[in-house]
Amino acid sequence: MNFLMLYSNQWVTGNKPIGLASLSAILKQSGHQFTLFDCTEYSIIAENAKENDRKTELGSKQMMHNSNALEFKYAENHERLPVPKPVTHKDLIDEFLRTIDRIKPDMIGFSGLTDDYPLGLGLMRHAHSSFPSIPTIAGGIHPTV
C-alpha cells in the first residue's frame, strides 16, 4: 500500500513526529510506501502580503520560535538551516492536493499537536473533498484525547 502522512507543524519548531517516524519505519519494513507531507517546510503568510512583508513575517516567526519559545538551543550558523517557503493558506492547500494527486496514496493520515490540529483538520477536509475515495485517519495527542 501507498501511505501519505501529513505533519501539520505550522510553528516552524524542531518538534519531531516520533509517532510518524515509527509508523514510517514499520510500514517500510513491511514493504509499503510512505510519504510525509511536512508543513514545517512552509510558512503560512497573509493572502495579501507583499514580498517585503513576507520576509518580515517569516523572519519574525523564525525568531519567535528559535529564541523566545525556549524549546530549543539557539543554533549556531542558523543561516545554514533551510528557510521555510512562504506560502498563502491557499497555496499550501493546493500543494497538498497536488502531492496527493502525484503520489496517489491508498490512505492519508495526519498527526499533530493541539496547536496544529486546525491546520491538519482543514487540509484533511480538502483532501477528503477532492479525493473522497481515499480513506483518511487522524492520530497524535489531540485526536486521541
Locations of the language-model features?
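Nucleotide-activated donor-dependent transferases that construct or modify glycoconjugates
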Residues: 1-12
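Glycine-rich, highly charged phosphate/nucleotide-binding loops
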Residues: 45, 50-69, 73-101
